[in-house]
């Protein structure tokens, strides 16, 4: 029996089960083109939760995202991951992805030049009943590991108020990035 499996059977002196971590109770798998619909659903739900989309715009966002995701996953412009309960591997409870863009050479530090790609973390979403269990952090750690292995020069993201503390704990910092929102 693995140590992680044994943990679930141990009990504290007060007879409560020992706390299990997200890594013990969830599995992570890569998304495929066949998963474009669930990724699009997560994306639309994420914006809905933030109050940025509702009604007909929800379905339009979902349909447009699905179409683009099918193309981008196939061409490896988008890499996604899902979390599933270890006991129910077909039940997707959370997801996250990286949108890849080539970038011009830039200094990574005073003596190293990066010439690869930038990854923008997007679509971080956990179904409401599964939140506050460490799943989003588990997905972001997977993305960080993958990005290091793939020599992605830089990871960026746009944090929601709810997600900011997760990203800060994992080493993300605020930057000087600004955004032009255009004229109405």
Would you name each region that the model predicts?
Residues 47-68:
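Conserved GNAT-fold acetyl-CoA-binding loop/helix
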């Amino acid at each position: 029996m693995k140590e992680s499996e044994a943990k679930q059977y141990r009990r504290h002196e007060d007879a409560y089960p020992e706390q299990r971590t997200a890594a013990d109770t969830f599995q992570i798998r890569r998304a495929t083109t066949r998963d474009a619909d669930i990724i699009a659903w997560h994306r639309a739900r994420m914006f809905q939760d933030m109050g940025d989309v509702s009604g007909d715009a929800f379905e339009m966002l979902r349909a447009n995202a699905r179409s683009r995701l099918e193309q981008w996953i196939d061409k490896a412009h988008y890499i996604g991951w899902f979390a599933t309960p270890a006991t129910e591997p077909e039940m997707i409870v959370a997801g996250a992805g990286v949108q890849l863009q080539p970038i011009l050479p830039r200094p990574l530090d005073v003596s190293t030049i990066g010439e690869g790609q930038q990854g923008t973390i997007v679509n971080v979403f956990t179904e409401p009943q599964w939140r506050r269990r460490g799943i989003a952090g588990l997905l972001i750690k997977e993305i960080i590991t993958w990005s290091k292995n793939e020599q992605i020069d830089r990871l960026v993201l746009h944090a929601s108020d709810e997600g900011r503390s997760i990203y800060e704990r994992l080493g993300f910092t605020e930057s000087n990035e600004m955004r032009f929102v255009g004229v109405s």
